[in-house]
Amino acid sequence: MSAKVVLKDFLSQAPIDKLKATLSGHLPVSCITMDAKITSLQPGYHFLFFSLASPESNLNSDGYESLYSPKPNNPFSFKRRIWLHGVLRFHRPLHLFQTSECHELIQEESVKSPSITKEVEACLPKSSFLTKPTSEKQTKHVYIRRKIYDSQHQLCIEEDRTLAYLNRQELAIPKTLRSKSIPQHSWVFTPTPIMVFRYSALMFNAHMIHWNATYATKSENYPNLVLPGPLLVTSMLEYFRSVYPQMSKNMKRFEFRLLSPAFVNQPLRICISETGNLWIDRFTTDLDPPSLIARGRVYT
């Protein structure tokens, strides 16, 4: 499967103000107040723009865009989708108050193996039961390559993202992952259902695991609503900018990997090491080290 789409959007201040309101009370105050005079999109703000606006009839049964899923005529029947990893590249400022274009290339690839990859297995929810496995153990990866141009058709931002679609019904208990780095800076916050709903609305993202608790817990066996991947990425980038504002201005690339789902009402900790590594883990007051949710790296 391969598809191309061009998404046009006017880059206004309004979605950014709504993002600040969404993050207010969760991230440091400096994250909310540091952009009083910005004239261009900051790292991660492009997630607020260039969303597909498909009618409901074009969405999958879980509310997600069918364009980013395996083709309907494909015999692969996925049970769950997972955002695995991505790369953001920043070439030049993308200024506000102009019409910009995002060119997307969507490609599908099958990954056949006797068992799903470790990175996918680590993202599966815990369950009190195991159902019968499907006849074909297979994972499909959907690669989305995005190139964002300004009104002068200059390339400003590139984004690569990888989604995984699982063709198995049985659930695995994820292994606990821990960071080997020591945080030099950290911030703890507890995402709420309202925070997740607001961010999903800003992205025009109707994926039901983010806003429908009954669907998330009963249909996909998660313990609660799931945080969107872009929200985790944005939180890391915003906290990094608040700690290292000058370095953020010279950011050329950001690589990230999502290792385990994060849920509402679960305390999370954003960390930055002295070497520039970022990660999010489940914050705990227990003696056991917190387990990793996501990790990233800034390159300047």
UniProtKB/Swiss-Prot annotation:
GO terms assigned for molecular function = (3R)-hydroxyacyl-[acyl-carrier-protein] dehydratase activity; oxidoreductase activity
In which broad location class does this protein mainly occur, judging by the first location in its UniProt entry?
Answer: mitochondrion
Q: Which domain of life is it from?
A: Eukaryota
Q: Top-level EC class, please? A: lyase
Q: Which residues form a coiled coil?
A: none
Function text: Mitochondrial 3-hydroxyacyl-thioester dehydratase involved in fatty acid biosynthesis. Required for respiratory growth and for normal mitochondrial morphology.
What's the protein name?
Hydroxyacyl-thioester dehydratase type 2, mitochondrial
Q: Which organism is it from?
A: Schizosaccharomyces pombe (strain 972 / ATCC 24843) (Fission yeast)
Taxonomy-wise, where does this protein's organism fall, top ranks first? Eukaryota, Fungi, Dikarya, Ascomycota, Taphrinomycotina
In the UniProt record, the gene name given for this protein reads htd2
